[in-house]
Amino acid sequence: MKEVFITNPSIAQEINTKTEEKLHQSVTITMIRNENPTATLGQFISHTTYQDLPEEVVKQAKRCILDLIGAAIGGSRTQVGKLLVGFIEECRTPKESTIPGWKVKASSPYAALATGSMAQDLELDDVNRMSHMHPGVSTIPTALSLCEREKKSGRDLITSTVVGYEVVNRIGKSVSPSILRDTVFHPAVLWAFGSIASACKVFGMDTEKCVNALGMGSLAPVAVEDPFRQGVMVKDLYGGWPNFVGIMCSILAMKGFTGSRVLIESDLGIAKVVSKKYDFSSIVKDLGRTFEIMNSGFKPYAACRRAHSAIDATFEILRRNKIDPKKIQRIDVGTFCAASRLSNTHPESSVAAKYSIPYAIALAILKGKVWIEEFDQNMLKDERILALAKKVRVHLDEELDRLYDSKWPALVKIELEDGNKYSSQVDWPKGEPESPLTDEEIKSKFVSTASTIIGKEN
């Protein structure tokens, strides 16, 4: 691939570069040096086509779309879903885009808002562990709603999804891992960039307009961590609101509204707001050659992804040993910093329970699964579960924390009353590229989440 490097942002405009060959079907774009990542991403969005996507990337995009739609349909009849759809119907917006799980249409921003929030509610949306992004929830709702509105094809849906994943994950990687070492949930602050990228691709916007749209991406909310600990509904809006913002920014840019051309890299830009460390080279390295969507981790459990290694380690102990839950004296969980905060032993809401490693481990031991119904409000009153959760101690393990974020490790130790001890360490939770879910497992997950709403026969 030929690459033309431009260092002057003032001439980083729409440039058509043609190459004599493509390397592994990679995207033909003009690259701008690392000090201009906002403009680089704008060009990537504008220039990328379906033909640029390798076969395995297309397949992965289909998996991601199916997974997200299943999570959204599953969350459509939760209290969050019902309240949001009721509110949106009261707004009487144009009937442009379908809200999954409902025979309701709304304007694209509102439909994407609902879809993202509903998908976030069940804690089943995908995660990129290296960027700490939830790329599906911040990208696919936008792509779905706008492709329906604009009457686009399935290929357009796939392309806009891949582009959104690429942009939001690369920005996330540039400020990781310190992004999760704070009281602000910075990933949600960045999610609008995925929505913006997807929207710009659906609209077919040129580089200049894409850059302006990205330059408005800081309008996403300052998403603090407290709602996760409190277990309140607003945390689900962290998944929905960036889609609303992203569509709005893209439409405004399409009409001529301007944003910062250096929003990501400026000394007053978004990177310096969300992280103490950043490396912009990760934004442009191999852009168009490797695709971040391939690094998505799919969730097999309805809980915060940071808890999954501990859940897997618990299941591994149970597979190897016959353990009587009544004989458990204590359970010790050492893990990385961001996961060690999930230490609540007595969650009072289903949301809080999904962010509790002690509760999840108790479910694994007593119920043999950690799925949607295990987080029902009535289950939170189960004295056996609560009593076992109180025996779980979660703490920061400095050695394991040094492996973060290339690994998300957890070491679980179970000690019985007779003194016997059992342990297991998991470095990559099930569903990561190193331990992937099969196509059949992803399909089964979709059926499990969606069938209660649309029926298995559909």
Residue ranges and their predicted role:
Residues 49, 122-126, 146, 150, ...:
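Structural motif corresponding to the C-terminal cap of alpha-helices
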Residues 120-173:
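Hydrophobic alpha-helical hairpins/lids featuring a short glycine-rich hinge
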Residues 137-144, 189-198, 244-248, 309:
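Well-ordered alpha-helical segments within folded domains of soluble proteins
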Residues 163-173, 214-225:
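Long, well-ordered core segments of solenoidal/helical folds
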Residues 64-71, 143, 190-201, 361:
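Hydrophobic mid-domain F-helix/FG-region of cytochrome P450s
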Residues 4-132, 229, 234-244, 251-458:
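Terminal-appendage/accessory-domain detector
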Residues 150-156, 173-183, 196-213, 224-236, ...:
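Active-site cavity-forming subdomains of large catalytic enzyme subunits
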Residues 130-137, 157-161, 179-192, 235-239, ...:
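Active-site nucleophile and cofactor-binding loops and adjacent substrate-binding regions
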